[in-house]
Amino acid sequence: MSRIGKKPVAIPSGVTINVAAGNQVEVKSTKATLNKTFSSDVTFNIEDGVVTVTPKNNSKNAIAQSGTARAILNNMVEGVSKGFERKLKIIGVGYRAKAQGSELNLTLGFSHPVVYKLPQGITAETPAPTEIILKGADKEVLGKVASEIREYRKPEPYKGKGVRYEDEYVAKKEAKKK
């Protein structure tokens, strides 16, 4: 069995988990609510403040799905209790960002400003014009949003200009010599 799938998921106080028919799982807290439909190869057992994910049979797929379901459920619980955060840095002359409500205005060297509409449940802050902090309860959606913003202007390898994750290292290349 999957080593990750064997570990139980602790339910913090203030978080409730409901498992409906068809493996529809709802994780609720005062901050956020997340819903996800899991594979029919796994079962969820809630008892004594912990959730255990077990495969329905010993097939390779069911065992793999149990580990995946446990990891996703753990991220859902952590997301509704603490939340997730992703930081992006903008490097380049004249490159900047500004958060305005549910939109993010990006100036990235194009002939037009890029207006990125944030999905529901994701908020953006710009403490500095070259810094973006994305926050949300759903780790998957947060990563997708960060990836889409980075996709507008990926860091180039010569000067490092572009949008990058805060912890990202960009390998620099040397310019051609005549």
UniProtKB/Swiss-Prot annotation:
Signal peptide: none
Biological process, per Gene Ontology: cytoplasmic translation
Pfam families found in the cross-reference section: Ribosomal_L6
MF terms in GO: rRNA binding; structural constituent of ribosome
Database matches in SUPFAM superfamilies: Ribosomal protein L6 (SSF56053)
Domain of life: Bacteria
Swiss-Prot/TrEMBL keywords: Ribonucleoprotein, Ribosomal protein, RNA-binding, rRNA-binding
PROSITE patterns: RIBOSOMAL_L6_1
GO cellular component term of the entry, any: cytosolic large ribosomal subunit
InterPro entries, sorted: Ribosomal_uL6-like, Ribosomal_uL6-like_a/b-dom_sf, Ribosomal_uL6_a/b-dom, Ribosomal_uL6_bac-type, Ribosomal_uL6_CS
UniProt cross-references to HAMAP family, sorted A to Z: Ribosomal_uL6_B (MF_01365_B)
Family assignment from sequence similarity: Belongs to the universal ribosomal protein uL6 family.
Function summary: This protein binds to the 23S rRNA, and is important in its secondary structure. It is located near the subunit interface in the base of the L7/L12 stalk, and near the tRNA binding site of the peptidyltransferase center.
Assembly description: Part of the 50S ribosomal subunit.
Protein name: Large ribosomal subunit protein uL6
The encoding gene: rplF
